[in-house]
Amino acid sequence: MTHLERSRHQLFPFHLVSPSPWPITVSFALMSFALSLGLTMHGYIVGNSVLFTSIILVLYSMTMWFRDIIAEGTYLGDHTLAVRKGLNYGFLLFVVSEILIFAGIFWAYFHSAMSPAIEIGGVWPPVGITAIGATELPLLNTIILLASGATITYSHHATIEGNRNHALNGLFITLWLIVIFVVCQYIEYTNAPFTISDGVYGSVFFAGTGLHFLHMGMLIIMLAVCYWRMRQYHFTTGHHVNYETTILYLHVLDVIWLFLYIVMYWWGA
């Protein structure tokens, strides 16, 4: 039932979601992923097969769930102004939770760096650890991320102004800048002079930058979906919630990376 037809019988602007199997499917898939990841890390052979199965199930369930959301908002007219506000508020709360996770990682880093234990030589970085220089690959990554923030803002303004070609070009450039960032980060990890097992320094460093790396992988998927939807004329000048949340996510990750760069690559090294 379209929004125009339903508005004759419904006295409120909210979307009453029809029964869906995807929330419970995603919940069980995530639980299976967490359990199998723990089993794999502790050397249980059965954990590998369950881990890959749960990853596939998570990706499939999330894809189908977002497919339904896109259909409800684009073709069925279910995303009224009130629903769009709710989606934006929900994503904002998700971003706040992500910021709090990184705040905990920074807390652990400062706790270890400002009061280094005697077991690591009483210095930071610990004795035997060669830190990655701030003027090496991390500086290039910082420039790439700042450039991506500029190109996505250009694309967003072009979308609002109805300039579809410029919006597509800006989004396409942004997508490839993020891909280059992820590749450079992978090269940095494979050539790093220390690992996640090298004491508290390696643990906190890879916990912070590695979590950001995983989020950048998620951002690539989100940008690719936005690019496909923009080419399919799913976005209008005033209705592009998916694009707005992706832009917010990119800017938040940009700011978090700046803190990571200043703290872990420049100050901490």
Swiss-Prot record:
Known function: Component of the cytochrome c oxidase, the last enzyme in the mitochondrial electron transport chain which drives oxidative phosphorylation. The respiratory chain contains 3 multisubunit complexes succinate dehydrogenase (complex II, CII), ubiquinol-cytochrome c oxidoreductase (cytochrome b-c1 complex, complex III, CIII) and cytochrome c oxidase (complex IV, CIV), that cooperate to transfer electrons derived from NADH and succinate to molecular oxygen, creating an electrochemical gradient over the inner membrane that drives transmembrane transport and the ATP synthase.
Subcellular location: Mitochondrion inner membrane
EC number: 7.1.1.9
Identification of the protein by name: Cytochrome c oxidase subunit 3
Reaction catalyzed: 4 Fe(II)-[cytochrome c] + O2 + 8 H(+)(in) = 4 Fe(III)-[cytochrome c] + 2 H2O + 4 H(+)(out)
Molecular function via GO: cytochrome-c oxidase activity
Source organism of this protein record: Wickerhamomyces canadensis (Yeast)
Homology family: Belongs to the cytochrome c oxidase subunit 3 family.
Primary gene name: COX3
